[in-house]
Amino acid sequence: MSKLMLKNALVNGAIQDILLEDGIISKMGPELAADTATVLLEQEGNLVIPGFVDCHAHIDKSHLNDKGENKYVHGTGGEKGALTRIAKAKFTVEDISLRAERVIRDAIKAGTLILRTNCDVDAIVGLKGIEALLGLKEKYREQITLQIAAFAQEGIFQDGKTPELLEEALRMGADLLGGHTITCGEGEKHIDFILELADKYACDADFHLDESGNREHYLLPYLAGKLKEMNMEGRVNAIHMCTLSALSEDELKKAIELILESRLRVTIAPTAISTRKIAPVKALLKAGVPLGLGSDNIRDFFNPLGSGDVKQMALLLSYLQAFYSEEENAAIWSMITDGGAKLLGANYEICPGASANLTAFSAKTPQEIISMQLQPSTIIRSGRILNI
C-alpha cells in the first residue's frame, strides 16, 4: 500500500504532519520527512478530524417519499405510523438495502465515520431490515462504522412474534436493542423486556424515551430505577427526552440527577421540533450529561427532508437553542465528533497507532464548517483516499 502524508494539518489543536502507512497512522509531528514513494497532501493549516458521528437514524425506512405512492402528509404521529406500516408490508431485503445504501453513501460523502441506526423488527417486516443492514455493514466496513439497533418500533407484546424476532436479530449480528416506550401503552413492561434481553446478550440498549413531550409519558424515573436494580448503569442511550422541556426547574434538576446517577447517555434529534419541544440541551451539557446528535428520520413519513449529513442537525440545533458563543460552538462540534463517538463507545482519535481514518476540510474552524455546511475536501478511510 502506498504511503500518504498530510502536510500542515490542523489536528488536535496544532499544525502537524500525519504519515499514513498500511492503514495506520505511523507518525505525527511538525515537518516530517517524506521519501519519494510518499504521496503528499498539503492541508495549508486546515482542519482534519477522524470524521463525524451520527448517533441516531432510521435508514431502513429512509427515502420512502422517493416512491410515487408514498407522499408526505401532515398529520399526527399515529397517522404517520399507520402510513409507515402500510409501506413496511411491502418491504423487501433488496428494497431496504437500496434505500439505506443511499443514506450510507451520502453520509460517507459528508464525512461521517460512525453511524448508529435503529432498524425495525416486528411481525410486519420481520428481519428483512436486519438482513439488509448487516449486508451493508459488511460492504462498507472499511469506510464507515455502522451500528445496528434491533428496534421494537411497533411495541413488543401485541403480536406474539416480536420478542423472538428481537432475540433472533441479536443472534444474526445486531449490535444492540432499541426500545420504543410510547408505542404499546405498556412502557414499564417494555423497558423491562428490553433491559432483560440486553442483559442476557451483554449488549447496550437505545430507548426512544419520553419523546412525546407530554408529562403523562414520563418514564425516566422508572428507567433509572430499573438500571440501578439490574446494575446496568451506563448501558443505555436515551433518544429525544422531549418531556424534559415540560418539567419545572426543580423537576428538571431532579431529572438530571437521575440521568447522572444511571449514567444515561442522551441523543438529541433536532428535527423533533416539528411536533414538540426538544430537550433543554444547555442544561444537560452544563450538568455533564454525555450528549450526541442524530439525523433521525430521513425523507420518510415522519420527515420529508434530510440527507444523512449530521452537520445539518448541528446547524439546526445551534439555531433552535442559540448555541452561538465560541464555547457553545465547541459543545455542538463535540456532539458530532469526539463526544458522539464516546457516547457510542467507538474509537475516535488521531494519534500514532490509530486507524488511518481522516476527514479534511478547506476550513480552519468548526464554526465555519457548520455555518457553511462544508463538505470534506479529502476523505481517507483505512489509509485510502475515497472517491465516492
Kindly give the residue locations of the regions a language model identified.
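Histidine-rich, glycine-flanked metal-binding segment
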Residues: M1-M5, L10-I49
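Divalent metal-coordination and catalytic microenvironments
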Residues: A9, G23, G45, H56, ...
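Di-metal (Zn2+ and/or Mg2+/Mn2+) metal-binding site signature of metallo-dependent hydrolases
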Residues: N46-G68
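Active-site gating loops and adjacent loop-to-helix segments of metal-dependent hydrolytic enzymes
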Residues: H63-I96, Y201, L219-N237, A255, ...
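Alpha-helical scaffold segments that flank or form the walls of functional sites
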Residues: N65-N118, I124-K139, E164-R171
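Histidine/acidic residue-rich metal-binding segments in metalloenzymes
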Residues: K128-E142, D159-N237, T243-R265, T275-L293, ...
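His/Asp/Glu-enriched, well-ordered alpha-helical/loop segment
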Residues: D204, K226-V236, K282-F361
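C-terminal cap of metal-dependent C-N hydrolases
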Residues: P352-I388
